Amino acid sequence: MSTVATTETKPAPAAIEKIKVKVDGREIEVPRLTADWSGKLTPTTMIQACELAKTEVPHYCYHPKLPVPGNCRMCLVEYGTPALGPDRKPVLNADGTPKIAKSPRPAISCATPISPGMEIYTSTPGVKQMREGVLESLLINHPLDCPICDQAGECKLQEYSVDYGQSASRFAEAKVHKPKAVDLSLIHI
């Protein structure tokens, strides 16, 4: 009895459309769709476009393999999209480039999908000020007492507090210290 090996060929996946966006003034091409945490194709988000542009956007709650909670707000960015006229066609500047209509408010980059011609601004003074405010509210009940922390200095909260100049909170309330469920000093190995 002989067996013949057969090679099964799978059809190539359809080419995913690429679109042009600008991240901090640098134009890049990114796929319109990317696989989400479950493998399903979903619209590419601003934070994914920034990662492809090698531009770091600080974040705590975003992870590419998990659903997007959008809770931490550290990934706030400013953005603009091509302005459209009454005929739904892009309004052009004198030099022929599309006029960009800047959004009146920031967006969380982990949950906002990109669109063709979008411009993303990750380091404007307004973005930095917003991140400082978000970080300050996160530090209200979190002491930066790193020697006793389990993370032992490998902590994004500590890194971002240094990057954004928040070594202490302006709020004078006492920190919330809850008792541990299990007193670790009683455990003997």
Question: Which residues fall in each region the model found?
Answer:
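Intrinsic disorder at enzyme termini
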Residues: 1-14
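Eukaryote-biased recognition of intrinsically disordered, low-complexity regulatory segments
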Residues: 15-26
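Short Cys/His-rich Zn2+-coordinating modules
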Residues: 22, 53-59, 127-132, 184
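Short, isolated positions in well-ordered beta-strands
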Residues: 28-30
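Short, structural beta-strand-to-alpha-helix junction motif
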Residues: 35-48
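A basic, amphipathic helix-loop patch mediating RNA/tRNA/ribosome contacts
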Residues: 46-80
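Fe-S ferredoxin-like electron-transfer domains
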Residues: 73, 77-78, 82-187
